[in-house]
Amino acid sequence: MNGKKLYISDVTLRDGMHAIRHQYSLENVRQIAKALDDARVDSIEVAHGDGLQGSSFNYGFGAHSDLEWIEAAADVVKHAKIATLLLPGIGTIHDLKNAWQAGARVVRVATHCTEADVSAQHIQYARELGMDTVGFLMMSHMTTPENLAKQAKLMEGYGATCIYVVDSGGAMNMSDIRDRFRALKAVLKPETQTGMHAHHNLSLGVANSIAAVEEGCDRIDASLAGMGAGAGNAPLEVFIAAVDKLGWQHGADLYALMDAADDLVRPLQDRPVRVDRETLALGYAGVYSSFLRHCETAAARYGLSAVDILVELGKRRMVGGQEDMIVDVALDLRNNK
């Protein structure tokens, strides 16, 4: 660690959207953002779970627009930067400009781990706006460390000043994480930061985040009570407690985070965010974590097991953006019964 302070990036108000089908009220956003700001996290990501303009038939309609959510958070935050997420092909540079005007100052431009080349326009425009611009390589378990490093190098070339290893499926272990960070560090400029976005489907969210920091990672994503897709993200309050015991600098108020997790976030969950039969299947099969709620809906509709659908999606190597295939897979399974 060398005494450097970790950059704590909260994702409760973006990844956490998946856990409640994108239904945060504006008051929920204000309360959670204020609590996070009071606890001194560095950034607070706000958007539909699938990023700017994710509200749709394919991904699920949000209770509010991205801009309403961003403005609500920006109104109450004094210390943290407001971040947002953009997936090229869902959000556009026009949406990014609107988010910036609403108060977002950090953007994470997210692509599948082998498709960094679709991010060039969005990364370049974010830099022109003066935003803290991050490349976000989703489903990082689906390619080799060496190939991931090549994709990271592309994003760096477009102008991203931080590149994330993103374990969208919660499918990686600590060795997988170490291998990927070592590969990235070998090719990126020394001044380019790296980040880790974990999911907890194998209960390794905190352990993987710690392994990332040990490999030189600068920024860590986490969420209150792990509020996120699948079994959730690395639980923020647990990560802070664990690294505090290691003597690492994080700048956050542990007890304030513990209170916010239990008092503000956990009561909102209509389905517990935890490792259980279905979310463990996500991590084991290496499936995009936000498929969980869609699979459970399809399983109920067609009289199937959600686990069977998830395992089949994993076999077919489905990735984020292919939510429409969940029903196709469910119908195939039903017809083959």
From Swiss-Prot:
<feature type="binding site">
    <location>
        <position position="199"/>
    </location>
    <ligand>
        <name>Mn(2+)</name>
    </ligand>
</feature>
<dbReference type="InterPro" id="IPR017629">
    <property type="entry name" value="4OH_2_O-val_aldolase"/>
</dbReference>
<dbReference type="GO" id="GO:0019380">
    <property type="term" value="P:3-phenylpropionate catabolic process"/>
</dbReference>
<dbReference type="InterPro" id="IPR012425">
    <property type="entry name" value="DmpG_comm"/>
</dbReference>
<dbReference type="Pfam" id="PF07836">
    <property type="entry name" value="DmpG_comm"/>
</dbReference>
<feature type="site" description="Transition state stabilizer">
    <location>
        <position position="14"/>
    </location>
</feature>
<feature type="binding site">
    <location>
        <position position="288"/>
    </location>
    <ligand>
        <name>substrate</name>
    </ligand>
</feature>
<protein>
    <recommendedName>
        <fullName>4-hydroxy-2-oxovalerate aldolase</fullName>
        <ecNumber>4.1.3.39</ecNumber>
    </recommendedName>
</protein>
<dbReference type="InterPro" id="IPR000891">
    <property type="entry name" value="PYR_CT"/>
</dbReference>
<keyword id="KW-0456">Lyase</keyword>
<dbReference type="InterPro" id="IPR035685">
    <property type="entry name" value="DRE_TIM_HOA"/>
</dbReference>
<dbReference type="InterPro" id="IPR013785">
    <property type="entry name" value="Aldolase_TIM"/>
</dbReference>
<keyword id="KW-0479">Metal-binding</keyword>
<dbReference type="GO" id="GO:0030145">
    <property type="term" value="F:manganese ion binding"/>
</dbReference>
<comment type="similarity">
    <text>Belongs to the 4-hydroxy-2-oxovalerate aldolase family.</text>
</comment>
<dbReference type="InterPro" id="IPR050073">
    <property type="entry name" value="2-IPM_HCS-like"/>
</dbReference>
<feature type="binding site">
    <location>
        <position position="168"/>
    </location>
    <ligand>
        <name>substrate</name>
    </ligand>
</feature>
<feature type="domain" description="Pyruvate carboxyltransferase">
    <location>
        <begin position="6"/>
        <end position="258"/>
    </location>
</feature>
<keyword id="KW-0464">Manganese</keyword>
<feature type="binding site">
    <location>
        <position position="197"/>
    </location>
    <ligand>
        <name>Mn(2+)</name>
    </ligand>
</feature>
<feature type="binding site">
    <location>
        <begin position="14"/>
        <end position="15"/>
    </location>
    <ligand>
        <name>substrate</name>
    </ligand>
</feature>
<feature type="binding site">
    <location>
        <position position="197"/>
    </location>
    <ligand>
        <name>substrate</name>
    </ligand>
</feature>
<dbReference type="GO" id="GO:0009098">
    <property type="term" value="P:L-leucine biosynthetic process"/>
</dbReference>
<dbReference type="GO" id="GO:0008701">
    <property type="term" value="F:4-hydroxy-2-oxovalerate aldolase activity"/>
</dbReference>
<feature type="binding site">
    <location>
        <position position="15"/>
    </location>
    <ligand>
        <name>Mn(2+)</name>
    </ligand>
</feature>
<comment type="pathway">
    <text>Aromatic compound metabolism; 3-phenylpropanoate degradation.</text>
</comment>
<dbReference type="GO" id="GO:0003852">
    <property type="term" value="F:2-isopropylmalate synthase activity"/>
</dbReference>
<dbReference type="Pfam" id="PF00682">
    <property type="entry name" value="HMGL-like"/>
</dbReference>
<feature type="active site" description="Proton acceptor">
    <location>
        <position position="18"/>
    </location>
</feature>
<comment type="function">
    <text>Catalyzes the retro-aldol cleavage of 4-hydroxy-2-oxopentanoate to pyruvate and acetaldehyde. Is involved in the meta-cleavage pathway for the degradation of aromatic compounds.</text>
</comment>
<keyword id="KW-0058">Aromatic hydrocarbons catabolism</keyword>
<comment type="subunit">
    <text>Interacts with MhpF.</text>
</comment>
